[in-house]
Amino acid sequence: MGRASRSAVLRRALLLLLLLLLLRTTTTRALGPRISVPLGSEERLIRKFEAENISNYTALLLSQDGKTLYVGAREALFALNSNLSFLPGGEYQELLWSADADRKQQCSFKGKDPKRDCQNYIKILLPLNSSHLLTCGTAAFSPLCAYIHIASFTLAQDEAGNVILEDGKGRCPFDPNFKSTALVVDGELYTGTVSSFQGNDPAISRSQSSRPTKTESSLNWLQDPAFVASAYVPESLGSPIGDDDKIYFFFSETGQEFEFFENTIVSRVARVCKGDEGGERVLQQRWTSFLKAQLLCSRPDDGFPFNVLQDVFTLNPNPQDWRKTLFYGVFTSQWHRGTTEGSAICVFTMNDVQKAFDGLYKKVNRETQQWYTETHQVPTPRPGACITNSARERKINSSLQLPDRVLNFLKDHFLMDGQVRSRLLLLQPRARYQRVAVHRVPGLHSTYDVLFLGTGDGRLHKAVTLSSRVHIIEELQIFPQGQPVQNLLLDSHGGLLYASSHSGVVQVPVANCSLYPTCGDCLLARDPYCAWTGSACRLASLYQPDLASRPWTQDIEGASVKELCKNSSYKARFLVPGKPCKQVQIQPNTVNTLACPLLSNLATRLWVHNGAPVNASASCRVLPTGDLLLVGSQQGLGVFQCWSIEEGFQQLVASYCPEVMEEGVMDQKNQRDGTPVIINTSRVSAPAGGRASWGADKSYWNEFLVMCTLFVFAMVLLFLFFLYRHRDGMKLFLKQGECASVHPKTRPIVLPPETRPLNGVGPPSTPLDHRGYQALSDSSPGPRVFTESEKRPLSIQDSFVEVSPVCPRPRVRLGSEIRDSVV
């Protein structure tokens, strides 16, 4: 293959790469929200609480009556009134709890950052009973736990007046950056965290109890886990087999059963029985019911896995019917690092979870660390199961009475072979979700699950699950950019959502139906909280069929606006009541813009001039932003209307009647009528009616940047390929240039002494050539034969050697001859 053919192949390959990259950039689309509300907008009521010199608001707890919100931050706790504390100047209770000086000093000595790490970060804030709260903090890498008296909101003290403090090891993480989970069940604390300073001793434990229990560290039941959530499911209610209540833990860990070139992260669900007391001889004070299974969340088309679990919300609408419990999980993928990291929302049913735990086991070979499916007979009672009626029939009423063979089997069979499969609800390529809260909302005709999703850049997405997809209702910027949503807490009875971040806590109403002024907007929002009354959009929960003058309208699944909004009168949101259009006064030969702000991101604009669609001309043009660019002239005036089109429904957004007025007339009219609406952006240098390029219907700026980047990349590749193909010639060229650049040096003249050779033969009659060594070459007359006496210098001074610092072969003078030496 010649050089020309190779260059042609390279060009074709580069063109193919360019085409693939362009196709990739144009086909990747994200599922976006219908409405976007920026930070500080008046369209959405968002109240924020922040205390001076306090940061890292991580722990949230709502009282049973919903009137008090307890907040845990860095070295401080707060009791907020849900109605007053979020108002400017509202009152609240504050409890300072900082790590003492000794702990901070020891933390600093151990190599931790004194300002960042050696503080007390509140990680646990839970109700212990009707009078006290349980709280735990990192306490400068030496975790502590304390009790808060609810009535006075102070730390509980003993009879001597000292604050009651307990060691938080095994209950609270040492590092504030470590993820952990905790919950209280019947006064007992169940936690999933690390119990060592180095963070290499993870454990699922039970404390605050007369029967402390934990996982066995020596058996490697947990592999570097990151706990995200835990849940209590009362499975004993209505159980025909007499089952026990269970506590579920959700986390991500290293999957030892997979053999890849890198550590594979796996999402897990683990469970323990509430009545587990450990074994009598084997697994003493260790869980005898610990089992774990893999949570599988992947794309249905190609099976791409989302294997990193970020958060789980347990939805149990009816505690009496725990079988309908749903687990909503937020997942990301470890293979999205370095690019825009996407997220996936998957839902797991209680039936799928139980099916995995009732299936086959995996067994690990301790010598080879190989995992395989256990196909041999399983001992009875079933290892890892709670004490049921079948066990009680065998006189086994407690885990302390379990046979040793059952517990020994559990040591190596704690991982289930089956996976907990899910249903993918939402795939979001352009947002990283971190927290989730779910509210089951009763609509006018059905019940819907509304998801509140917190992102890593301070946004909140509100979405509703439909029969075939998930519709993102709105997007709220609740925190500044760069501040992730650290926690979400839903007050379903009060209709409020609380979110926390590094800078504070915000209170967001779950719905704002007044944001939708027309019947079309109200129905197209697909918000289960809202319904159209015939004249306004109101909360659907306020609907009383007996008192309403007409039935309210709501269509979450279909949003059939054309049929349901026929009899509803609507008006443009920017029209003055009683006038067909908005009067706009412009000056001659000026460039003016007519705004058309759409409420929905999913709608498109249609500009109409005197009943006909606007076409690009010298006098008007639609900008990429959707606004209309208008040149002030007497030609082409009339009525300009902007229509919003969404899912086939068209409604008027704005209507303008521009009027060109001379400056003198305009000044007189201003003095007489007040201040009219004048839209003037800039003057044009072209004459009135002349053609000028004011913009384009579509902007290709992003495509232009992509093409420029790819062109530069292709040129760099071609240049590197050229250098590679001619590397030998370049080396020779550089070598010759370096040798030629060396300046000749003046060689000292050495006069040999006038002595005769020992053999008595006189010197040759041919005159000696005294040219310098750089003037000699190998093309000179052939070498002459020297005698042994001539080869040997007459004296040490007769020999002269000089080596060039660049050229590798030195020149050597032997007697009267100068030659290249071979080194």
Swiss-Prot record:
SMART domains the record matches: PSI (SM00423), Sema (SM00630)
Taxonomic placement: Eukaryota, Metazoa, Chordata, Craniata, Vertebrata
Entry-linked Pfam families: PSI, Sema
Name of the protein in question: Semaphorin-4B
Alphabetized UniProt keyword annotations: Developmental protein, Differentiation, Disulfide bond, Glycoprotein, Immunoglobulin domain, Membrane, Neurogenesis, Phosphoprotein, Signal, Transmembrane, Transmembrane helix
Ig-like C2-type domain span: 589-649
Keyword Disulfide bond: yes
Organism: Mus musculus (Mouse)
InterPro entries documented for this protein: Plexin_repeat, PSI, Semap_dom, Semap_dom_sf, Semaphorin, WD40/YVTN_repeat-like_dom_sf
Residue ranges annotated as Extracellular topological domain: 31-703
Gene Ontology biological process: cell differentiation; nervous system development
Chain segments annotated as transmembrane: 704-724
Topology of this chain in the membrane: Single-pass type I membrane protein
Disulfide bonds: 107-118, 136-145, 273-386, 297-346, 513-530, 596-642
Domain Sema: 34-510
Record's function text: Inhibits axonal extension by providing local signals to specify territories inaccessible for growing axons.
Subunit text: Interacts with GIPC PDZ domain.
Record-annotated PSI domain positions: 512-582
Example of a GO cellular component annotation carried by this entry: membrane
GO terms, molecular function: semaphorin receptor binding
Cytoplasmic compartment segments: 725-823
Subcellular location: Membrane
Family named by the database record: Belongs to the semaphorin family.
Glycan attachment sites: 53, 56, 83, 129, 397, 512, 567, 615, 680
Keyword Cytoplasm included in the entry's annotation: no
Signal peptide interval: 1-30
